[in-house]
């Protein structure tokens, strides 16, 4: 029974990290598409849009990093 609980713990950590990575990839893809739409619509605002794009992309990309940290914590510290 203990071995089954450990397996479920590892699977839960893997699902958490995987779903966070997939969600961030989708979010960055949508964000990049909207950046290109805005840059094509108003080329004079590209420097402002680029700055905002990189700030938001960093925030979106931080979510999977936090999920990886929590997943590794669950796998090695809790287990």
UniProtKB/Swiss-Prot annotation:
Keywords: ATP synthesis, Cell inner membrane, Cell membrane, CF(0), Formylation, Hydrogen ion transport, Ion transport, Lipid-binding, Membrane, Transmembrane, Transmembrane helix, Transport. It holds the Pfam family ATP-synt_C. GO terms for biological process: proton motive force-driven ATP synthesis; proton motive force-driven plasma membrane ATP synthesis. Residues 32-52 are cytoplasmic. Changing residue 28 to V: In DC1; has a functional F0 as well as F1 part. However, the ATPase activity is inhibited. PROSITE patterns: ATPASE_C. InterPro entries: ATP_synth_csu_bac/chlpt (IPR005953), ATP_synth_F0_csu (IPR000454), ATP_synth_F0_csu_DDCD_BS (IPR020537), ATP_synth_F0_csu_sf (IPR038662), ATPase_proteolipid_c-like_dom (IPR002379), F/V-ATP_Csub_sf (IPR035921). It comes from the Bacteria. Residues 1-10, 74-79 are periplasmic. GO terms for molecular function: lipid binding; proton-transporting ATP synthase activity, rotational mechanism; proton-transporting ATPase activity, rotational mechanism. The modification N-formylmethionine is found at residue 1. It is found in: Cell inner membrane. Its main location: membrane. The record marks 61 as: Reversibly protonated during proton transport. GO terms for cellular component: plasma membrane; proton-transporting ATP synthase complex; proton-transporting two-sector ATPase complex, proton-transporting domain. It is a multi-pass membrane protein. SUPFAM superfamilies: F1F0 ATP synthase subunit C (SSF81333). The keyword Isomerase does not apply. Changing residue 61 to G: In DG 7/1; contains an enzymatically active F1 component, but no functional F0 component. F(1)F(0) ATP synthase produces ATP from ADP in the presence of a proton or sodium gradient. F-type ATPases consist of two structural domains, F(1) containing the extramembraneous catalytic core and F(0) containing the membrane proton channel, linked together by a central stalk and a peripheral stalk. During catalysis, ATP synthesis in the catalytic domain of F(1) is coupled via a rotary mechanism of the central stalk subunits to proton translocation. Belongs to the ATPase C chain family. F-type ATPases have 2 components, F(1) - the catalytic core - and F(0) - the membrane proton channel. F(1) has five subunits: alpha(3), beta(3), gamma(1), delta(1), epsilon(1). F(0) has three main subunits: a(1), b(2) and c(10). The alpha and beta chains form an alternating ring which encloses part of the gamma chain. F(1) is attached to F(0) by a central stalk formed by the gamma and epsilon chains, while a peripheral stalk is formed by the delta and b chains. Dicyclohexylcarbodiimide (DCDD) binding to the reversibly protonated aspartate residue inhibits ATPase in vitro. In this organism c-rings of between c(8) and c(12) can be isolated in vivo following experimental manipulations, however only c(8) and c(9), in addition to c(10), are partially functional. This is ATP synthase subunit c. It comes from Escherichia coli (strain K12). The lineage of its organism: Bacteria, Pseudomonadati, Pseudomonadota, Gammaproteobacteria, Enterobacterales.
